[in-house]
Amino acid sequence: MKNVIIDLQIASEDATNLPSVEQIQLWANAAIRAENSQPEMTVRIVDEEESHHLNLTYRGKDKPTNVLSFPFECPDEIELPLIGDLVICRQVVEREATEQEKPLMAHWAHMIVHGSLHLLGYDHIEDDEAEEMERLETEIMLSLGFTDPYIIEK
């Protein structure tokens, strides 16, 4: 299996308690499972202001969110290893981890896995899609040594 190349951008004023690029790569690898290519993705860690702006601009939601996924769409005749960008809001991830009583790094891992699956084309708009995506997320998180990220909801 080939490693996902991670371009980590930290655009948060507070860079403490963030996962390392190696951790992010491990979590993304588990979700993407690249066999024949070496995919590349950007992970941008931002503050609430940027997350809010992007969420409003691209999803019409007037609030910050935990993770936004921007899949890279390339013309069929061009082969590039880019799969897309993840934008993750530090404050939202920290707040959710506290509210859900989860270890912070487990929640960071879940956001990387969740966002990576979106980059691969998975979605959770329809119930059947949501069930499949949650099943995959749980399987991947367990393989990484974390607990089921949806345990509080089940």
From Swiss-Prot:
Cellular localization per UniProt: Cytoplasm
Cofactor(s) listed: Zn(2+)
Binding site for Zn(2+): H114, H118, H124
BP GO annotations: rRNA processing
GO cellular component: cytoplasm
Main location: cytoplasm
Keywords for this protein: Cytoplasm, Endonuclease, Hydrolase, Metal-binding, Nuclease, Ribosome biogenesis, rRNA processing, Zinc
Cofactor: how bound: Binds 1 zinc ion.
Broadest EC class assigned to this enzyme: hydrolase
Keyword RNA-binding included in the entry's annotation: no
InterPro entries linked: MetalPrtase_cat_dom_sf_prd, YbeY, YbeY_CS
Lineage: superkingdom: Bacteria
Classification via PROSITE patterns: UPF0054 (PS01306)
Keyword Transmembrane helix: no
GO terms assigned for molecular function: metalloendopeptidase activity; RNA endonuclease activity; zinc ion binding
EC annotation from Swiss-Prot or TrEMBL: 3.1.-.-
Alphabetized PANTHER family for the sequence: ENDORIBONUCLEASE YBEY, CHLOROPLASTIC (PTHR46986:SF1)
Function noted in UniProt: Single strand-specific metallo-endoribonuclease involved in late-stage 70S ribosome quality control and in maturation of the 3' terminus of the 16S rRNA.
Family designation: Belongs to the endoribonuclease YbeY family.
Name of this protein: Endoribonuclease YbeY
